[in-house]
Design a protein with these regions (language model features):
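Short loop/turn and capping residues at structural boundaries
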Residues: 122, 138-139
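Terminal amphipathic alpha-helical/low-complexity segments used for targeting or macromolecular assembly
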Residues: 1-125
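A structural motif detector for beta-strand N-caps
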Residues: 127, 133, 139-145
Length: 145
């Protein structure tokens, strides 16, 4: 192996924790910006209140990640089982634009349900521009899509 990974069985929990902390910090800042931009009275709104709301939303979102992962697993399975040309699950994950669109949607939908302004639509529009598939973050799509 040319480049040895520092991640091992012994360090995976540490690395995951660091990444989750980074996600929480970055997402909190973006949610804060979205909340401020959406609130036309934000000039008079206490910064601490919006900051606390953004952090709470980010934390709640992070706790939904296992649920999102589970839904995506059913989506991969459904796509693989429904397409005789699919060689394996990895091909569906890495090569199918529909999976990219549904992945972005699943993340955006959770943020949408949490009341985050702007960001969910931006996430689905990223997939739309890359794949041509437009899914509104408020759409209700069950498992095995």
């Amino acid at each position: 192996m040319l480049f040895r990974s520092r991640i091992s069985k012994q360090t995976i929990r540490f690395h995951t924790g660091v990444n989750v902390e980074t996600l929480h910090s970055l997402l909190s800042k973006q949610v804060y910006a979205g909340l401020c931009f959406a609130d036309t009275s934000c000039v008079t709104c206490p910064e601490e209140k919006i900051s606390a709301e953004a952090e709470a939303i980010s934390e709640t979102f992070i706790f939904t990640l296992p649920e999102i992962r589970g839904l995506l697993a059913t989506d991969v399975e459904a796509t693989f089982n429904g397409d005789p040309a699919a060689q394996n699950l990895g091909e569906v994950i890495f090569c199918y634009p529909g999976f990219r669109a549904i992945g972005n949607y699943r993340i955006a939908h959770q943020l949408y349900k949490l009341g985050v302004p702007y960001i969910p639509r931006m996430i689905t529009e990223m997939a739309h521009s890359e794949t041509g598939i437009d899914i509104h973050p408020g759409a209700k799509i069950g498992h095995h899509f």
